[in-house]
């Protein structure tokens, strides 16, 4: 028996997130099914996190246990010959038997991409959130400093989340301008349900000068979901990196 770690890239457009659910297509279900066909085993793939419907990933990590004779470091090549076009395995390797993709990760980096122009996107329509109001990126950058560090992020969590604690630590948050795109990068030890998308919704209000950067500090301290911005669409969100 071996424990194999996979790194996947996927386009989440046609999937209802990572985690298996009844009557919908998910990334986990697709990957488990194909690995099972390759190995002839019933496979349980453990993911590093849940990604919501429509969210993308550039380096999603997962692991599974198998008795296959295929060398772990070659498994991704076999897998790619069968995976659909919107999922690709970037790497595979053998890891210790007690390695767990979710519980062993130390943090993640997400990006959220905003197309800041009046015209909607054609080519990138599934990967950016088109936002026509002109944004003040300097104010947005100033606002990000108020989410850095360890806080109770209740204000940035959608209802329906069942977690023991809303305390999370944000290590880095930055705004990058790339022509007419505004990209928000955030790295933390973990994220609450819709947390990144609500932070972005709040930063958009700062960018439009509806609220001040200092208001973000007040929103964090309030622990009140109604004080923060809206949940922006999933399609602009991408899991960039998982740290171990």
UniProtKB/Swiss-Prot annotation:
The record ties this protein, via PANTHER family, to: PSEUDOURIDYLATE SYNTHASE (PTHR11142), TRNA PSEUDOURIDINE SYNTHASE-LIKE 1 (PTHR11142:SF0)
Entry EC no(s):
5.4.99.12
The active site of this protein is located at 52
- A biological process (GO) annotation for this entry? tRNA pseudouridine synthesis
Superkingdom of source: Bacteria
InterPro entries named in the record: PsdUridine_synth_cat_dom_sf, PsdUridine_synth_TruA, PsdUridine_synth_TruA_a/b_dom, PsdUridine_synth_TruA_C, TruA/RsuA/RluB/E/F_N
| Species of the source | Clostridium acetobutylicum (strain ATCC 824 / DSM 792 / JCM 1419 / IAM 19013 / LMG 5710 / NBRC 13948 / NRRL B-527 / VKM B-1787 / 2291 / W)
Q: What is this protein called?
A: tRNA pseudouridine synthase A
Chemical reaction(s) catalysed: uridine(38/39/40) in tRNA = pseudouridine(38/39/40) in tRNA
Q: Outline the subunit composition.
A: Homodimer.
């Amino acid at each position: 028996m071996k424990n194999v770690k996979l790194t996947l890239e996927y386009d989440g457009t046609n999937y209802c997130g990572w985690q298996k659910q009844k009557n919908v297509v998910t990334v986990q279900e697709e990957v488990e099914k194909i690995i099972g066909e390759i190995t002839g085993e019933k496979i349980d793939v453990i993911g590093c996190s849940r990604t919501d419907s429509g969210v993308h990933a550039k380096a999603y990590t997962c692991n599974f246990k198998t008795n296959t004779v295929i060398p772990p470091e070659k498994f991704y090549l076999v897998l790619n010959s069968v995976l659909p076009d919107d999922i690709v395995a970037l790497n595979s390797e053998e890891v210790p038997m007690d390695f767990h993709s979710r519980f062993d990760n130390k943090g993640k980096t997400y990006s959220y991409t905003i197309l800041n122009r009046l015209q909607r996107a054609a080519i990138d329509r599934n990967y950016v959130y088109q936002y026509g109001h002109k944004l003040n990126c300097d104010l947005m950058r100033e606002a990000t400093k108020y989410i850095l560090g360890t806080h109770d992020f209740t204000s940035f969590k959608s209802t329906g989340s069942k977690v023991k604690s809303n305390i999370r630590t944000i290590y880095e948050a930055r705004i990058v301008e790339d022509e007419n795109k505004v990209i928000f990068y955030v790295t933390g030890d973990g994220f609450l349900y819709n947390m990144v998308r609500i932070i972005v919704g709040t930063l958009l209000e700062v960018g439009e000068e509806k609220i001040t950067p200092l208001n973000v500090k007040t929103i964090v301290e309030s622990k009140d979901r109604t004080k923060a911005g809206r949940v922006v669409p999933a399609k602009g969100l991408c899991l960039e990196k998982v740290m171990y």
